[in-house]
Regions:
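Juxtacatalytic substrate-recognition/specificity segment
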Residues: 1-75, 86-95, 101-108, 112, ...
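Beta/coil-rich, acidic/histidine-enriched accessory regions frequently appended to metallopeptidases
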Residues: 123-129, 155-267
């Protein structure tokens, strides 16, 4: 796969060169993009704010894989769902806020119009929510139909199936039932967010006691590691959080604590 990085030149910024390469205009909303054949990105050293360029590159490379696997027949929402899911990061707090606001109101896209949420978003929030809804479709598929359902849907698109054809073929239910299940899944996600938000803040001694009683509990260990980090016992925090991530590499709080310490190490 050809990878292109753009830097400032001839009075134009790196992002302007990248944008011109991708859309023929001096501005595009993102900093990295894939056509399915190449990956282009604004040079990380040319950005005003730090960016996880490895995360961006992985995301775009998944687009290359899924677009080529399906002969470019994959819907926009599904290639984004798989690309975001491959990053392996917890759902952003901003997305949780959008879910809390929009799911109860029923302000949602569905399989028929979700791709338009990227093409004609109308606002940054709508654009972010399109990503959020897309990856939650993938998570819903895994929970209800199993991990293999993701690759089965890819294969259906490879065989030139439309989404209307692919859903009953891959999942064994009609589209209405599939969408109903997705809506129920979103309700559960929102309930989980509210439950987390409603939990009272634990006192330091409670966190420590909970960890001492439940050292094999990844959440208890991650909370204690976060506490140790905050009181400057970074070596102890790192030992505990590394042990959690070794067994649970995608644990949200452990990943956050580990990343926070790495950022502080760089300062």
């Amino acid at each position: 796969t050809q990878i292109e990085l753009y830097s400032p030149a001839k009075g134009l910024s790196a992002h302007q060169w990248f944008s011109a390469r991708m859309v023929g205009l001096p501005w595009v909303q993102t900093i990295g993009a894939s056509t399915g054949v190449i990956i282009a990105m604004t040079s990380p050293t040319s950005m005003e704010e730090p960016v996880n360029w490895a995360r961006v590159m992985k995301h775009e490379f998944v687009h290359v894989l899924t677009l080529q696997q399906t002969n470019f027949n994959i819907p926009h929402w599904y290639t984004e769902a798989l690309a975001v899911r491959s990053e392996g990061y917890p759902r952003p707090v901003e997305w949780n806020g959008l879910l809390l606001d929009r799911v109860p109101k029923g302000e949602l896209k569905n399989l028929d119009n979700l791709s338009m949420g990227f093409i004609r978003a109308g606002s940054q929030a709508n654009w972010n929510f399109a990503y959020c809804q897309s990856v939650l479709y993938a998570e819903y598929m895994v929970e209800r139909f199993g991990e293999a359902s993701l690759s089965k849907l890819l294969d259906a698109y490879r065989r030139n199936r439309t989404t209307d054809q692919a859903v009953p073929e891959v999942f064994g239910v009609d589209k209405a039932d599939f969408e109903k299940g997705y809506r129920a899944y979103l309700d559960k996600v929102v309930a989980d967010i509210r439950k987390t938000d409603d939990e009272t803040e634990k006192k330091p001694n409670q966190i420590e006691k909970n960890y001492e009683k439940n050292k094999d509990d990844p959440q208890a260990a991650a909370e204690y590691a976060q506490l140790l980090m905050m009181i400057k016992k970074r070596d102890d925090a790192r030992t505990i959080v590394d042990a959690v991530l070794e067994k649970h590499p995608k644990h949200p709080l452990a990943a956050y604590v580990s990343a926070s310490m790495l950022v502080r190490d760089e300062k």
